[in-house]
Every structure is written in C-alpha cells, then in structure tokens.
C-alpha cells in the first residue's frame, strides 16, 4: 500500500483577527491521503474544507496539531520549498493565478522561479500544456480564453512544477457547465494516467461522486470518509448537514422509501438506468 503523501494529526486552526482569536475553523482533524488517490472534500461554505486545503502546502500553519507532506512537517521552515514542490494549489479564480500575457510564458513562470534550466523549462511547458489539452493555445493571450481554458492553463502552470499532488480549491466554482466538464475531465485524466494525487475541494455533488474517496466536512469536523457510493447511501445523514445527494441517488432513495427494493449505489444517470432496468426484468 502506498505511503501517505498528506497527513494531519489532530489539526486545529483558528484565524487571528484584530479583535483577537476567531472561532475554531478546524477542530482536531486527523486524516491520511495516500499517493495516487483521488479524494474529494465536500462541505458547505464555512465547513472548513478550504482552510484544510491551504494547510496541505503550508499556506496556513496549524494552531495546534500537525500536518505532514510526504513525511515533512509543514511548520519546518527549512522544508517549505520542498513541500511546495510536492503539492501544487489551484484556486477558484484562474485570473488570480495567471501572471503572464502569453499562455506558454505563464506556464513557464513557476519553473523559472525554481531555477530550472531553459531547455528543461521548454520541455516542461510543452508536456504540461499537452497534459491539459492546451497545446494549440500556447501562444495565445490568456485573457482571450474561456473560463475553463484559463483554469486548464492554471493547472498546467502547477504541473510544470512537477508536483506529486495537486490540491484544487473549488476550481469550477466560477465556470459554466462546459468549463466545469473540461476541468473535471482534465483532473480525472491526470490522476488516472499520470498517477498524480488529487485533492478536490468542492460543494458540487456530481464532482464529488467522480472521486475514489469522499470526505464530508461540517463545522470543522470530518463527518464521513469513504467511497462515494458508500457515503451517499446515508441520505438522511447528509441532508441533516444541509447537503444533498446526486440526483440518481435521490431518485432511488425516493423509490426505496416507497417500498421498491433498489440499491442506493448508482451515482450516475447510466448506473441509475441500469439499476431500474434490472429491477424491471426481475
């Protein structure tokens, strides 16, 4: 079994304000994410999911407890560069991460700051753009791209740093359905084909359903942790947290409430149709 690339031990965090210390945002969170996993972290605004994400590459440091990246303590200043090389971050608004006026120059920005030789930078840029399907836009101006394309450029900029893990904090929040699909397809491909560990912070049920593992957060605590088809079976528990379930699960749940014996493990429309077809032929 792969070793943990991300690990928290009783992680507690409180923001400091001018008035003093604010309420606890993360309260004793302990989890372990292994190399190669695709993990979605689901929760409402204020659940602590984005604050947790910012601990994974030491943007934030614990008030109490520990965070380890590939065994390195994020509070160890001497390890900060190594930690950020291993874990890349992608945020909600791609415009806040794009720094150059040409796509390929933007993707090259990170490696240049690491002192990577020019020939290797060229190779990294080409590979990163190919990985996100943006090669043909290498010489385009980023501001002329669609939202989904901009976010893919932001992901390419992180990939050019050669991280072992990418943490994406609500990367589709500002995108239309087409842009969302572009970004989600890219994330899944990077995990499946390149073996990059992915942590996706989201409040979209359909996005969370695509992960291999789902962590549900509420009020700074982990409320559930398992495979999506397992977590989403607890319809009443999720609804008590103000969360919904994917539409196929909701449909099957209503059928079950009416006395129809159907499983709640179908997360997609096709899986739901298959479950209903099987029911009708029995």
PLM features: residue spans?
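The feature captures the beta-strand-to-loop junction immediately N-terminal to the Walker
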Residues: 42-44
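Helix-to-loop junction immediately C-terminal to a conserved catalytic motif
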Residues: 57
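Conserved ABC transporter NBD signature motif
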Residues: 65-75, 83
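Conserved ABC ATPase "signature" region
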Residues: 119-137
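Conserved ABC ATPase signature
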Residues: 141-145, 149
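Catalytic Walker B motif of ABC-type/P-loop ATPase nucleotide-binding domains
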Residues: 166-169
């Amino acid at each position: 079994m792969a070793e943990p690339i991300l690990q928290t031990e009783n992680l507690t965090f409180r923001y400091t304000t001018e008035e003093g210390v604010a309420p606890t945002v993360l309260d004793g969170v302990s989890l372990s994410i292994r190399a190669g996993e695709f993990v979605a972290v689901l929760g409402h605004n204020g659940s602590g999911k984005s604050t947790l994400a910012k601990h994974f590459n030491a943007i934030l440091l614990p008030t109490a407890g520990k965070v380890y990246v590939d065994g390195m303590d994020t509070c160890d200043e001497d390890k900060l560069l190594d930690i950020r090389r291993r874990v890349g971050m992608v945020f909600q608004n791609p415009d806040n991460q794009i720094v150059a006026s040409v796509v390929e120059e933007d993707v090259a920005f990170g490696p240049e700051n690491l002192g990577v030789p020019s020939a290797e930078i060229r190779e990294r840029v080409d590979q990163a753009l190919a990985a996100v399907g943006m090669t043909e836009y290498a010489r385009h101006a980023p501001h002329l791209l669609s939202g989904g394309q901009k976010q893919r450029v932001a992901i390419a900029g992180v990939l050019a740093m050669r991280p072992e893990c990418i943490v994406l904090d609500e990367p589709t929040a500002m995108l239309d359905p087409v842009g969302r699909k572009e970004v989600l397809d890219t994330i899944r491909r990077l995990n499946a084909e390149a073996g990059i560990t992915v942590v996706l912070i989201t409040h979209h049920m359909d996005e969370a359903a695509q992960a291999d593992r789902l962590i549900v957060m509420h009020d700074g605590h982990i409320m559930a942790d398992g495979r999506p088809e397992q977590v989403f079976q607890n319809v009443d528990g999720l609804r008590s947290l103000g969360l919904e379930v994917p539409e196929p699960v909701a449909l099957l749940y209503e059928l079950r409430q009416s006395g129809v014996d159907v499983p709640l493990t179908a997360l997609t429309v096709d899986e739901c149709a298959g479950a209903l077809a099987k029911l009708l032929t029995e």
